[in-house]
């Protein structure tokens, strides 16, 4: 098994939410904040703790560094040390153009992930964990970090952890899965975007700016080193 120099971390704020045109409303149920559709053979449950690593989407499938956590719950990528618990990922590779994207997001299916025709997700890579590593579990399509916070897409399309419940205005708080290839997926898409902001990257579920590049978020096993 190949070890990757990847570290993942996450953090969040706290509020509650419901699905509406404006996103989640505090005090309402949030587990139904899911995208339309699901990816083929995506597993909505993976109870063994895992991390996630940024993988650039290029013709050569080049690997990048893994994600780390800072204090406010945003998922980010950076080459600097994380200090505030937002989720971050360090990266030394030059972001690729969005025109070069090769995505499996269009491969949707209503097939249940537990069907005999679907393989159980296999995590191909491992990473050493440390005090700043983002540790995740997945249950019933809900992504949770080690502090019990909920992985969500908030109003500005950014990926971060909050609550529970998720913060007001959150768009999605469930519908996560792991594909047969070992990638994190949300609804019917396994493509995310890292967008440069100063010396780090914030992570989003959509391409929100020119400085964004398409990525996969690879689920990796975490080990003590």
Swiss-Prot record:
Its main location: secreted. Keywords: Cell wall, Cell wall biogenesis/degradation, Cleavage on pair of basic residues, Glycoprotein, Repeat, Secreted, Signal. Covalently linked to beta-1,3-glucan of the inner cell wall layer via an alkali-sensitive ester linkage between the gamma-carboxyl group of glutamic acid, arising from Gln-74 within the PIR1/2/3 repeat, and hydroxyl groups of glucoses of beta-1,3-glucan chains. Residues 78-92 have a biased composition (Polar residues). One of its GO terms (molecular function) is structural constituent of cell wall. PANTHER family: CELL WALL MANNOPROTEIN CIS3-RELATED (PTHR47254:SF1). This is Cell wall mannoprotein CIS3. It comes from Saccharomyces cerevisiae (strain YJM789) (Baker's yeast).
